[in-house]
Each structure stands twice: as structure tokens, then as C-alpha cells.
Amino acid sequence: LLGKTHGGDEAVSLVFGGDEDAAELHLLCIFAQNGGSAALRILRAVQVAEGRHLDALIALQDCNARYRFVKFCFPGEDERSVQMEMDVLFLPEMRPDLCADLCVKGMHLMLGICAEAVPELRQLLS
């Protein structure tokens, strides 16, 4: 799905359907209006059970120390949903296909980390 964010940035959104063992993954790639970067996001990677907020903060801090290229966090005021984030910077002289390739490689890295970290987080925080 191609669209624009509330701020007017171009965005590509992908949703991978879950099965009995995995929830849906919402991948988002937001291209900055100035063309210098893209924000890669996996939305709602983990849902935190009621009363597990402190456990979630500790677990996310551990994930942030272990997985240096991806940030695990709560988006905005939502403290029940864990989001994964990565930013990709582009050089002014880069061709568009190279920028797209960096985004794909970044998402691939994020999905690999997601596959490793999220099952453990879901078990711990549900």
C-alpha cells in the first residue's frame, strides 16, 4: 500500500498475515520529504499484557542492548504495543534504486531480528 503520512511524507506499508502462532506484522517505510532518509518500522510487533509494563521496559532495554541496529520502543503514548524502528540515511548522489535497495536490506535485517526476538518477548510479556 502506497500513501502519505499525516506529515506529508511518502510511505509504503506492507502487512504480513499471521497464523495461529504469529500475529500480523505491519511493516512501514516512510520516506522523508527531503529525500535524505527513510524511517523503517514494524508496528505492533508485541502486545503487552495488562500489568506487564515494567517487565516490558526491562525486556525492551535488554533488546536494545542486544540488537544494536533496531530500536524496540513504545510508540507515543501506547504502552501496550511494542514497535521496532530503524532509520536509513541516503547520500545525495545515490540513485533511487540504491536507496530502495538499502530500505529492502534494512527491512530484511529487521525481520531477522523480529524472528529472533519477538517470540521470546511475546512469551515473556503476554
Q: Model features per residue range: what roles?
A:
Residues 119-126:
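Short, highly charged C-terminal tails/helix-capping segments
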